[in-house]
Amino acid sequence: MAKQVPERSSKPAEGKSSSRKTAAADNPRRQKLWRDLALIAVAPLLLYLLASLFTYSATDPGWSRTGNLVAPIHNMGGRFGALAADVLLQLFGYVAFLLPVLLGAVAWIALIGDREEQTQSDLGPALRLVGMVGFLISSTGFLHLRLFQGEVAEAGGILGKLVAGSLSSRFGALGANLFVLVLLLVSITLATGLSWFAVMERIGKWVLALGPLMQRKTHQATEWQQTRVMREEREEVRKVDAVKQAKREPVKIEPPPAPVVEKSERAKRDTQIPMFQGVSTDGSDLPPLALLDDPKPQTKGYSEETLETLSRQIEFKLKDFRIEAQVVGAYPGPVITRFEIEPAPGIKVSQISSLDKDIARGLSVKSVRVVDVIPGKSVIGLEIPNVSREMIFLSELLRSKEYDKSASPLTLALGKDIAGRPTVADLARMPHLLVAGTTGSGKSVAVNAMVLSLLFKASHKELRMLMIDPKMLELSVYQGIPHLLAPVVTDMKEAANGLRWCVAEMERRYKLMSAVGVRNLAGFNKKVKDAIDAGQPMMDPLFKPNPELGEAPRPLETLPFIVIFIDEFADMMMIVGKKVEELIARLAQKARAAGIHLILATQRPSVDVITGLIKANIPTRVAFQVSSKIDSRTILDQSGAEALLGNGDMLYLPPGTALPDRVHGAFVSDEEVHRVVEHLKASGPVSYVEGVLDEVQTMGDGTVVGATGLPESSGGGGDESDPLYDEALRIVTETRRASISGVQRRLKIGYNRAARLIEAMEAAGVVSPPEHNGDRTVLAPPPPK
């Protein structure tokens, strides 16, 4: 029983302790709930009081005035709101408008604000309430002293009047103002915790930052002013430009002629290859034009609207670089379109020429070529490639009237100019042609077009060719045609022999023309032909018949033109060297009157290939696309070829001018070349001239062709009978050097005689034959001392 009593008494004790814990746990919750309810109740009351104050009307009945009880109330708070607003305004003046805010702050502090700080200090809420009361008293007194001291309800109200009156009577106006101001500042500090020293420090920082801020604002204002002025200037310029655009004449757009190429009479005849007409066996007939492919229909270039738009774009792009210019004309062509630009006074051509790449980038085209001078016009040309490029066929050019009207058998069909008109040239007037460009620029196709132009214009009786093809690919296809002097040359040593023969033939023709009394090959052929037609042929003055052998005098015959094609001039220069350059220079200097002409082609336009000696004697040049302005200047002595488009696009420098013409070369397919070659092979047998490629060449009058191509007597000095042979032998055996130039220099004789002396020593076994590098070994021992 004793054990059961404590158990019974312990249960009530445990229940009491648990109830206390529950009450303690519920107490903060209840306090928070009551605070929230109190704030919810106070908030509408403060809003009601604030609305009553702001809608106060002096006509409403109140504490200080009586009115009509049945009159409408203007105050939003009704009659009670009008009474409360009148009481507050009369008591506190303008500070009454802040009273709801102060009451709200007091409610917040009392209910929520300082519950966390009560554990640290019990004076916090009390000091804040004291500060708010002090703020109310000091603010009303300050307003009454400083603003208005008239009616009771003005400024600080009754409270302000009492405070200001009591202070003024004791301390005077100055003392009252100072006291009220100090009380106001202290009250604000107590109510809010604001530190006036912190306020002054912050104000000082603001004042110090005011200087840089003003500088920035001043700078921004200056920039804004400048921007505004520039904007106004641009607007003014736009207005002026708009007026100019409205007044300016439209761009002159000259469309290409409808029939760009007029067919010749020969083209009308050669519409197809004759099937039943016999082919001439002597090769005198020209190949029909039907062997060539007909041109295909081409797409049009830029429309007039596009040309007008491009003209405006060019003007705007130049204006971006501060260049005033106006597009006055547009001339569309098969490959490019030329825009004529009239620059403003004071604008240099070099300023526009230096912007070619920038203009090309702005117009989104591959390249732009600037033409500095257009003959007969005061404008600058700007050549822009077309979007769709027209393919030019050789058959168009050979069927044109320009090609057919040319009476020269050396007429070359080069292509079309920028307007689409055929461009033909006379090789006899050039009289030599240099063709240069990078690989893939259309150089070999252009050479084939030139060859076919000559083959369609002249028979093998009027024209003979010597073709040198170091690459063994381009010109070898013409092997076996009756126009060739010798087989197509692929060995460069034979090429040197062929050039030596041409030099000797040039000298022989000069002697014939001198004997006949004419100045060029055309006059010589005319005189010989007239004599043959008259039945009194002229005898060869250089042929000396041998009566012992029964030889009769040989009559003269007309001489054909000779055209020498060298497809890759650089390879031949590398293999043969200076010797070939001298032969080519000699032909270029003198061969025009003799009817011998050169067409040199190279894909390496460098100064070691196109030397000054060659450029001085070959003024007519064709430049295809090159990689740099330096290469263009090497070929044409001016830039421009670096801006070409490739695929036959060329700059043609005619003889006697310094301004190149832009020409778009004609395309010739391999099938067309093979058809023409097969037709020429069937028209006549090949008739090579003997000895053209031989190492030792003898002319018809018995003279031997020397190393320089000049004829030398076969029985002249230079062998063992030469009086200088022994002296030359002594020099060679003593110096142990078998050099032609050394013998020539020591004996002070000509090159040909020194060469014959060395050859005589080789025949006598004194020196060895020349090795692959041209050196000889002295085999004989030195003379005894």
Swiss-Prot record:
> Where does this chain mainly localize?
membrane
GO MF terms listed in the record are: ATP binding; ATP hydrolysis activity; DNA binding
GO annotation, cellular component aspect: plasma membrane
Regions of biased composition (Basic and acidic residues) lie at 1-14
Q: How does it sit in the membrane?
A: Multi-pass membrane protein
What UniProt keywords are attached to this protein's entry?
Answer: ATP-binding, Cell cycle, Cell division, Cell inner membrane, Cell membrane, Chromosome partition, DNA-binding, Membrane, Nucleotide-binding, Transmembrane, Transmembrane helix
- Family annotation (Gene3D superfamilies): 3.30.980.40, P-loop containing nucleotide triphosphate hydrolases, Winged helix-like DNA-binding domain superfamily/Winged helix DNA-binding domain
Q: Which residues lie on this side of the membrane: Cytoplasmic?
A: 200-785
Q: Which Pfam families match?
A: FtsK_4TM, FtsK_alpha, FtsK_gamma, FtsK_SpoIIIE
Cite the record's note on assembly. Answer: Homohexamer. Forms a ring that surrounds DNA.
Annotated protein name in UniProt: DNA translocase FtsK
Q: Which organism is it from?
A: Xanthomonas axonopodis pv. citri (strain 306)
The record's gene field reads ftsK
